Amino acid sequence: MKTSVGVFLSASDRVSPSLLEEAKNFGSRLAEKGFHVVYGGASCGSMGALAQGVLEKKGTLTGVIPEIDILQELVQPNLTEKIVVPKMSDRKEQLMEKSDAFVFFPGGLGTLDEITEVLCLKSLGAKNCMKPVVFYNYLGFWTPF
């Protein structure tokens, strides 16, 4: 069974082209190394770029998608596995359950919310969060924290 890496990142289209390229390259590297990628399931922003990188290298990809994203047609169409959940909080729970490690890519408020929840639960000893955590510090994004 492949090791699953949960990647938390942005679906916003208001990210720099260099960050999109970095996300795509990261997805490619994960696929080349044989990791299964679990992420938020979007086809846009750095989420979409990550998925593109994974899929171009014939990697496997699980998208955990809240119903609101289905309605807005933001879903990556070529997912290996698609999990639809009612709410954003359910998405976080599934991402934590399905991942063997967590990577926090530069993102916005949603990513910060996910970081806070994972680290809080990890500090409390929650079983689904007692996994390695990596902050992908692209261009020093996480340095102030």
What spans do the regions from the language model cover?
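N-terminal alpha/beta PP-like core and its mobile active-site loop of ThDP/TPP-dependent enzymes
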Residues: 18, 86, 98-101, 111, ...
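Solvent-exposed alpha-helices and their adjacent loops that cap or buttress functional pockets
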Residues: 1, 31, 74-77, 94-97, ...
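Short Gly/Thr/Asp-enriched flexible loops that form oxyanion-binding sites at enzyme active sites
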Residues: 48-53, 113-126
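Short, acidic/small-residue loops that bind anionic groups at enzyme active sites
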Residues: 65, 105, 119-145
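A short, small-residue-rich loop immediately preceding and capping a beta-strand
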Residues: 36-39, 100-110
